[in-house]
Amino acid sequence: MGLMTRIADKTGALGSVVSAMGCAACFPALASFGAAIGLGFLSQYEGLFISRLLPLFAALAFLANALGWFSHRQWLRSLLGMIGPAIVFAATVWLLGNWWTANLMYVGLALMIGVSIWDFVSPAHRRCGPDGCELPAKRL
């Protein structure tokens, strides 16, 4: 993955989690963790975080993972990287107001964090170049 898509992916994931930490009424587990590390002052901005910033950061992470596919051509990595932001975006824009939206948001945020850690620990490598695709060597 290119440097810009890696930075955008990490920014999207981190921004989504910090935005969710600012909403004590919506996500009490994340809000208690946010208050423990000193983010309690963000509670006055929770409307802005949930309605504007959280979908924006989720869309940024989705776009970064979609553009990353053009670099490494690993569809499973890109798909897993795009599912989390899509869940977060759907929970904050289309499904807001349902009783299970917070649980869906937790799943999306956890998936975003998990894929970001996976990408940090094991970065994607290029599989296809302009001259064609290289297949891995066969084992006998």
Swiss-Prot record:
Subcellular locations according to the entry: Cell inner membrane
Any Pfam family: MerC
Effect of gene knockout: Mutation does not affect resistance to mercury.
Record's keyword annotation contains Transmembrane: yes
Topological region Cytoplasmic: 2-10, 68-78, 128-140
Residues bound to Hg(2+): G22, A25
Keyword Transport: yes
Highest taxon, organism lineage: Bacteria
GO molecular function: mercury ion transmembrane transporter activity; metal ion binding
Record's function text: Involved in mercuric ion uptake and binding. MerC-mediated Hg(2+) uptake does not require MerP.
Protein name, entry field: Mercuric transport protein MerC
Organism in which the protein naturally occurs: Shigella flexneri
Source species taxonomy: Bacteria, Pseudomonadati, Pseudomonadota, Gammaproteobacteria, Enterobacterales
